[in-house]
């Protein structure tokens, strides 16, 4: 059992706009938010960075260069909304009960290295699981985070002149049935998991708190 105390977040760091809509958000809307903020940062590098923490309506997204062989449904008649997008990675599923974190960051303020950025996002997820008393881990040569033999978090990003988009998706208390319609991330030999399989009383607000805390730690973000 986890025993998390939600207290105050750190009060130092780079001022960063944090958006946490309480309602479910259509994927296209969230994607548009990111693109507009990215344009602002490209136009004026001194602008604030931005992070969104939200949950989506059911949808599938297919990253650039991904294989349609990993879609186990008729592409012409998808069972739910389906989007081809500009992030890296293969196909994934977004749905209620999954915490999605989108980051529009200027990597010139950190390190202009996409592999470093991906590993930092994994570190954020590992921090969150550790804060819940779970043993998360990476698998060499793959991107994402696993727990007890199951992949619980996916990462997919895009970057334009070192300004990022997209981010991470962490399965908290979502229905996993929709993952049966795809080969998640193109990985045939791995099962998909969710955190409340091991922590039945886990609440999304706890995960959000730990996510904000770790993003402050790993990227020095001060929430405004």
Swiss-Prot record:
The keyword Lipid biosynthesis does not apply. It catalyses: octanoyl-[ACP] + L-lysyl-[protein] = N(6)-octanoyl-L-lysyl-[protein] + holo-[ACP] + H(+). GO terms for cellular component: cytoplasm. One of its GO terms (molecular function) is lipoyl(octanoyl) transferase activity. Keywords: Acyltransferase, Cytoplasm, Transferase. It is found in: Cytoplasm. Its EC number is 2.3.1.181. The active site is at residue 185. Its main location: cytoplasm. Pfam families: LplA-B_cat. InterPro entries: aa-tRNA-synth_II/BPL/LPL (IPR045864), BPL_LPL_catalytic (IPR004143), Octanoyltransferase (IPR000544), Octanoyltransferase_CS (IPR020605). Coiled coil: none annotated. The record marks 151 as: Lowers pKa of active site Cys. The keyword Acyltransferase applies. Pathway: Protein modification; protein lipoylation via endogenous pathway; protein N(6)-(lipoyl)lysine from octanoyl-[acyl-carrier-protein]: step 1/2. One of its GO terms (biological process) is protein modification process. It is an enzyme of class 2 (transferase). Residues 45-223 form the BPL/LPL catalytic domain. Gene3D superfamilies: Bira Bifunctional Protein, Domain 2. Substrate binds at residues 87-94, 154-156, 167-169. Catalyzes the transfer of endogenously produced octanoic acid from octanoyl-acyl-carrier-protein onto the lipoyl domains of lipoate-dependent enzymes. Lipoyl-ACP can also act as a substrate although octanoyl-ACP is likely to be the physiological substrate. HAMAP family: LipB (MF_00013). In the reaction, the free carboxyl group of octanoic acid is attached via an amide linkage to the epsilon-amino group of a specific lysine residue of lipoyl domains of lipoate-dependent enzymes. Belongs to the LipB family. This is Octanoyltransferase.
């Amino acid at each position: 059992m986890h025993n998390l105390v939600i207290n105050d977040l750190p009060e130092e760091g780079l001022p960063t706009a944090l958006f946490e809509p309480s309602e479910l958000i259509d994927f296209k809307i969230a994607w548009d938010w990111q693109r507009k903020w990215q344009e602002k940062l490209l136009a004026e590098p001194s602008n604030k960075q931005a992070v969104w923490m939200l949950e989506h309506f059911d949808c599938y997204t297919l990253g650039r260069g991904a294989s349609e062989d990993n879609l186990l449904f008729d592409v012409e008649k998808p069972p739910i909304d389906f989007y081809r997008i500009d992030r890296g990675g293969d196909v994934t599923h977004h749905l209620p009960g999954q915490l999605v974190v989108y980051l529009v960051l200027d990597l010139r303020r950190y390190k202009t290295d996409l592999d470093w950025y991906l590993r930092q996002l994994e570190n954020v997820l590992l921090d969150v699981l550790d804060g819940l008393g779970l043993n998360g881990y990476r698998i060499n040569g793959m991107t994402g985070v696993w727990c007890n033999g199951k992949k619980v978090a996916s990462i997919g990003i895009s970057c334009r002149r070192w300004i990022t988009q997209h981010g991470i998706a962490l399965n908290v208390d979502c229905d996993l049935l929709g993952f049966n319609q795809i080969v998640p991330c193109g990985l045939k030999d791995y099962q998909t998991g969710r955190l409340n399989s091991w922590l039945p009383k886990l609440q999304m607000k706890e995960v959000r708190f730990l996510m904000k805390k770790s993003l402050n730690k790993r990227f020095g973000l001060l929430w405004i």
